[in-house]
Amino acid sequence: MTRLVLGSASPGRLKVLRDAGIEPLVIASHVDEDVVIAALGPDAVPSDVVCVLAAAKAAQVATTLTGTQRIVAADCVVVACDSMLYIEGRLLGKPASIDEAREQWRSMAGRAGQLYTGHGVIRLQDNKTVYRAAETAITTVYFGTPSASDLEAYLASGESLRVAGGFTLDGLGGWFIDGVQGNPSNVIGLSLPLLRSLVQRCGLSVAALWAGNAGGPAHKQQ
C-alpha cells in the first residue's frame, strides 16, 4: 500500500486532502526558511522561492522517513508545500504580529494578488528516492475591503497569523475575498490539479491513493 505523507502541519492542507479522499500520514517538516531564502539571493522570483522551500521541506521529511520510519519509506509519496502572497511588489508569508497583519490587509484591500504555492513531491520505494519533482501553482486572489471594525475583529481572531498573506479562503477571511482566478485549493495551500499531475508522473494514480489512504484517522508525528 502506497502511503501519502504530508510534510506539513497545516490544517488547511490536511483538510484539502481529506476532502479529496486521502487520509495522509502527517509529519511536519522542520526547515529554516530564512536560510533557504537567503541562499536564493535578492533577485529570486516568487515561483522559485516557494518551489525551493517546498522541495527542501519534502527532502527533510523524506530523510526522516528513511532514517526512522523505514516501513513507511518502503512505499510512500512525500508531499510538502510552501505558500506566499505576491502583491504590490512584495512577497508576503505569515505575518509576524497583529500589527504586521493589519498593515498587510490595508495594502491588500481592494486589490488583486497572486498566491504562489510550491509543491515538493518525493516518491520513496524500498527506502530510496525513485522520483523527485517540485513545481509551483499560481492563483489570483481578489481582495474585498473590510470595514475597520470587521478588520479588527478578524485580526483579534488570530487566524491571520497562521497563514501566508494573513488571510484564508476557507475560514473567517473568506468573508473578505471577492473572488479567485485559478484553482481555489491552491489558495488553501495545496493545488489538487498540480498534485494529481505530479503523482501521475511518479507512476501512481490518485485513485490508488484513495484506496490506500482513506478510512482511518490521520497519524500525526512531530
Curated annotation (Swiss-Prot):
Molecular function terms from GO: nucleoside triphosphate diphosphatase activity
GO biological process, one term: nucleotide metabolic process
GO CC terms of this entry: cytoplasm; peptidoglycan-based cell wall
Catalytic site: D82
InterPro entries for this protein: ITPase-like_fam, Maf-like
Superkingdom assignment: Bacteria
Keyword terms: Cytoplasm, Hydrolase, Nucleotide metabolism
Membrane-crossing segments per the record: none
Locations listed in the record: Cytoplasm
Function: Nucleoside triphosphate pyrophosphatase. May have a dual role in cell division arrest and in preventing the incorporation of modified nucleotides into cellular nucleic acids.
Anything else known: Was identified as a high-confidence drug target.
Family under the similarity heading: Belongs to the Maf family.
Protein name: Nucleoside triphosphate pyrophosphatase
Species this protein is from: Mycobacterium tuberculosis (strain ATCC 25618 / H37Rv)
